[in-house]
């Protein structure tokens, strides 16, 4: 009889190590103001989960624009710096600094209003690949 742990291990993930190598950060179309380092989680989980280390390329030059993500789970952990968000339906901005963890509800429209030039975050999503959809201007 196969244990539940063995079945889960075989079905869900593989060992992957993503070393912090020079040149590991790449720019993506999604946010040209940031560069991303793929942490190998998508490959290890067959695309079920994605994890990226994101960092700002420079200072914020203005709000990023209202948008939402077509995914089931979205977590952002602030490693360094500060970011200011605005969510649809909220009457105040949320300022998150190093050590803060944000779990965004699926389909929730939001806007990144400002961030520091040294901003670095860990982003975890389910699934790894998802669409980002522009939302109507909610300001």
Where are these regions (language model features)?
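A short, N-terminal "cap"/entry segment at the start of jelly-roll beta-barrel domains
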Residues: 1-58, 134-139
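Short histidine-centered beta-strand/loop micro-motifs
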Residues: 28, 62-70, 87, 94, ...
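A short hydrophobic beta-strand segment most commonly corresponding to one strand
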Residues: 49-52, 102-103, 116-133
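Short, conserved beta-strand element in jelly-roll/cupin
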Residues: 53-56, 68-85, 124-127
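Structural motif
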Residues: 82-84, 109, 118
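Short acidic-glycine-tyrosine-enriched beta hairpin
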Residues: 89-107
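Short, surface-exposed secondary-structure boundary micro-motifs
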Residues: 107-108, 113
């Amino acid at each position: 009889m196969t244990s539940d742990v063995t079945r889960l291990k075989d079905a869900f993930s593989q060992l992957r190590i993503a070393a912090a190598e020079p040149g590991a950060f790449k720019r993506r179309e999604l946010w040209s103001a940031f560069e991303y380092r793929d942490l190998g989680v998508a490959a290890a989980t067959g695309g079920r989960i994605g994890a990226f280390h994101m960092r700002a390329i420079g200072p914020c030059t203005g709000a990023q624009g209202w948008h939402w993500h077509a995914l089931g789970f979205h977590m952002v952990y602030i490693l360094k710096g500060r970011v200011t968000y605005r969510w649809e339906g909220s009457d105040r901005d949320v300022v998150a600094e190093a050590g803060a963890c944000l779990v965004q509800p699926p389909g929730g429209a939001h806007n990144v209003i400002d961030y520091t030039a040294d901003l670095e975050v860990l982003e975890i999503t389910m699934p790894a690949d998802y669409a980002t959809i522009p939302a109507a201007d909610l300001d």
